[in-house]
Amino acid sequence: MGFSDLLNPQNPESTPSTPANKSSAPSTPSTGQSNSNMTSVSLLPPLMKGARPANEEPRQDLPRPYKCPLCDRAFHRLEHQTRHIRTHTGEKPHACQFPGCTKRFSRSDELTRHSRIHNNPNSRRNNKAQHLAAAAAAAAANQDNALASNAASMMPPPSKPITRSAPVSQVGSPDISPPHSFSNYAGHMRSNLGPYARNSDRASSGMDINLLATAASQVERDEHYGFHNGPRGHHIFGSRHHNSNRLPSLSAYAISQNMSRSHSHDEDDMYSHRVKRSRPNSPNSTAPSSPTFSHDSLSPTPDHTPLATPAHSPRLRPLGTSELQLPSIRHLSLHHTPALAPMEPQPEGPNYYSPTQPHVGPSISDIMSKPDGTQRKLPVPQVPKVAVQDLLSPGFTSVSSSASNSVAGGDLADRF
């Protein structure tokens, strides 16, 4: 049997074998040969890759009207063409509907296969996604709580009218935010902190030196208002006022700052000039402090000399021989003074030079106004003709000394 016989099993030689099998028994060898031929034909389609079953041959002849405009492929159905075009364009219209999943697919069967991951409770990917979502939610909640606690701890005390009242029990814990009544907050500071008590919880609760200085200034102001009404004992901060060897107290520091500035309740202004101050109860502190005003004598002169000039020092002016006294506190400006005080001339007082004093010789303006250039010369200074009393007079001292000590004045005297 040749290869052509295998491809064409329905040849005329094999057709009579079937009737012979039914009619008589002597045709048994032909029947066995025909069975071997059918077995070879049944095994042939798996061996031949290009061959198709006989029942699919009519589909190969069906028309393919739906052709891809981007390539040479054609399809029987429109949805097949549409699905194929998405491979060229990259369109993925099928999105996953599971919350938190952002995957998209171009085919609906891919979406169905992907949805089984979320629907299967035993999936490792599903458990991992749930753990990640829970961890992200917990981290966001912790961050919100931390921001809220920081905002509450850094909240300044409210600026309300101050009234004396007893402390309330709600301010017993240092970890809570400042209470609604500032007087209760001041009473809590007066009763629980003690004279310069070092509390380890103060740093963790956000109560920095600004809040303590404000509270101490309130206590000091209340004690100062009731000082003239009757005899009062020394309060808890009073022991630091009369000891000049120690650093000034916190309440006196706050009062000295408030006396030179306006008594407004602007917390930004109150905090701006206390930022770089060191802790007053530190024994090794070297930061300069402001002058401390005692209760017994509210004199304009401080109890001790500061290491640096405060920001509210009086404006500089030339001093004479008869007055070496600073102005009183009432003459100081109550407004916010700049860091560098401007040097403004102040005409009042007997120690300043006045233009009413007599001049010797022509003035500089008269010399410069002369038309002739040869006459524009400075006259020879007549120093020997001035009396000794005029040199020692307070009105002439500042002018003559400044003119004689200057380099330009010495050059003019040597020139002539």
From Swiss-Prot:
PROSITE patterns: ZINC_FINGER_C2H2_1 (PS00028), ZINC_FINGER_C2H2_2 (PS50157)
Molecular function GO terms recorded: RNA polymerase II cis-regulatory region sequence-specific DNA binding; zinc ion binding
Residue ranges with Basic and acidic residues bias: 54-64, 263-272
GO cellular component terms, semicolon-separated: cytoplasm; nucleus
Biased composition annotated in UniProt, kind: Low complexity: 280-294, 398-408
Pfam families: zf-C2H2 (PF00096)
Post-translational modification: Ubiquitinated. Deubiquitinated by creB, probably to control its activity or amount.
Subcellular location: Nucleus
Zn finger (C2H2-type) start-end: 66-88, 94-118
Main location: nucleus
UniProt keyword annotation of Repressor present: yes
GO biological process: carbon catabolite repression of transcription from RNA polymerase II promoter by glucose
Bias kind Polar residues: ranges: 7-42
InterPro entries in UniProt: creA/MIG_C2H2-ZnF, Znf_C2H2_sf, Znf_C2H2_type
Region (Disordered): 1-66, 107-126, 153-176, 258-319, 339-378, 395-416
Keywords carried by this UniProt record: DNA-binding, Metal-binding, Nucleus, Repeat, Repressor, Transcription, Transcription regulation, Ubl conjugation, Zinc, Zinc-finger
Gene3D superfamilies: Classic Zinc Finger
Similarity comment: Belongs to the creA/MIG C2H2-type zinc-finger protein family.
PANTHER family per record: REGULATORY PROTEIN MIG1-RELATED
Quaternary structure annotation from Swiss-Prot or TrEMBL: Interacts with creB.
UniProt function note: Transcription regulator component of the regulatory network controlling carbon source utilization through ubiquitination and deubiquitination involving creA, creB, creC, creD and acrB. Represses the transcription of the alcR, alcA and aldA genes by binding to a GC-rich region in their promoter. Also plays a role in response to carbon starvation and the control of extracellular proteases activity.
Descriptive protein name: Probable DNA-binding protein creA
Protein species of origin: Neosartorya fischeri (strain ATCC 1020 / DSM 3700 / CBS 544.65 / FGSC A1164 / JCM 1740 / NRRL 181 / WB 181)
